Amino acid sequence: MGNEFMKEKSILKNTIYYLIYNVLNLLFPLISGIYAARVLSPQNIGEVTYSQNIVQYFVILAFLGIPTYGIREISNARKNKEELDKVFSELFFINFISTLFFLGLYFILILSVESFRNYSKLYLIMGMLLLFNIFNINWLYEGLEEFKFISLRNIVFKSISLLLLVWFVKDDTDYLKFAVIMTVGTIGNYLINIIYSRKYVSLKLKKLNFKRHLKSILYLVSVNIAIEIYTLVDVSMLGFFCVKEIVAYYVYGSRIYKILLQVMNTFTMVIVPRLSYLYSENKKNEFNEILTEAVKLILLLGIPMIIGIQYTSNNIITLIYGDKYITSAAVIKLMSILLVLTPIGYLLGSRILLITKNEKKMIIAVSLGAISNTIGNFILIRYYGEMGAAISTTLSEILVMLVYVYLGRKYYKLNLKFKELIKIIFANLVLFIFLKILNEIK
């Protein structure tokens, strides 16, 4: 009983720390966006956002799936210091070489495409995120469940970035300063990562076996490419087909949704190292118990969020960004239905397949999502702008969730009781009626 309590307490602490970390990662762009919306023009905000979107493609490619794969491997090796050092060193050097390669490709792209050359300073600034990706070893700390360090480190650098933003960005001509500050917090985190890592691991140069990681990494590279296509293609196509103001409307709307989604995903992210460990130790009962509790938590938190957003999104957008971004409210309303579906798909599909070493099955789900979202965006964006992107992304996410859950179904057994589900439904029905009546009165 005592051991179980300690485990629950540990997961609770990790959840709180990781919630702070992930919400802050999204609150920082939100808060900085609030300030920027009142200082910079939608055109320049759109340019900065679009450049971030482009560099993100290269960051994901350079990572080779290591953020996901590394958590599992570090978690499995954490009881053996020698093996832990070896796994860390192998993955670090793979990421090092890959990042340098894709950094070269990124600079070739900037020099080759005229629209990028016109904003070359902006793209060079954003390219720093790719360069310092060499030192992004969050997967080490997540695999070791060192969420307190991750969270506190993030608070410090995000706070510094916000102070710099208010101090230096004063008018529309300061959009390059805005871009620099957007990168400062992230790069600072990476540098502290590598310095602090000496407490847990030593970088080895001898007797390394890179080959043993290649098969899983190649699968995850394919998965990550597909994921990034269906998660980044909306902004990319909006930037291609529409004026940059439309990009800003969509990004500001989806950003609030992503903050709420991060809250929903936090618990599932935190338990991945624990689930991986339990699965490797063949502790099926504990494995299924934690999964069941996670699904119940998703339902308890997600459904009220969806209902609340339907009645408050207009006020939220006006309060945060001002009246000129009111069209972003419709984006939040539509995408909010994913606040339950996406975390369930992530947990019962993507994470389960990774933990059980079935990475190759993940390709099926994300490839379908990438194809459907690309086609959907191509058709809908030209006619419906930001709402076309929102519709396409929502439908693609639903498709991915269904495929994920289907593929992962045989590796776990949920113990959801009918009475518990009825209570959740009834409580949310009461909330829906209350908000509807309140809205009618207003």
Name each model feature, range by range.
Residues 1-7, 11, 148-151, 175-182, ...:
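Interhelical loop/hinge segments that connect adjacent transmembrane helices in multipass membrane
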Residues 7, 70, 137-148, 169-170, ...:
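C-terminal transmembrane helix end/exit motif
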Residues 10-68, 103, 162, 182, ...:
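Signature of the first transmembrane helix
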Residues 32-58, 175, 212-220, 238-258, ...:
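Interfacial/gating helices of multi-pass transporter permease domains
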Residues 33-34, 63-79, 253, 257-295, ...:
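Helix-loop junctions and terminal segments of transmembrane helices
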Residues 37-45, 111, 116-120, 144-190, ...:
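Membrane-interface helix-loop junctions in multi-pass transport and translocation proteins
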Residues 109-126, 309-341:
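Interfacial segments at transmembrane-helix termini and the short loops linking adjacent helices
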Residues 130-154, 337-368:
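Membrane-interface junctions at transmembrane-helix termini in multi-pass inner-membrane proteins
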